[in-house]
Amino acid sequence: MTLDDLIIKTVSPVVKPVVPNLYTGESVRYCTFNYSELAEGIGDNAAHLTRALVQVHYFAPLKASTLAVRHALRDAIAAVDNFTLPSIENATDETGQHYVLEFDAVGRWEAEDDGQS
């Protein structure tokens, strides 16, 4: 399973749709995610693990009640063995609510083919 697959599997029971990077659909409530990868557990000139600095972005209409969903997202992420408890940053602006859940993921995942040579 790739890290993308694991994030989607974790977030989608709470919010759908959930996609990497950019959502271009019609839903007014959705999640996107992105992450940076760092070598972890380095020894014998090799990285034995990867630490991903993950951001899950939850978007909703300005007047929507989102507290229960934000807490459900936090709890779902925290329940994954190799994910840390996320912080939640409010990035809301005049176009809608936007919450960023930031956490670390440490492990070994299958490689994701990004389609670039």
Region spans (language model):
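Long, contiguous binding/interaction regions
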Residues: 1-53, 59-117
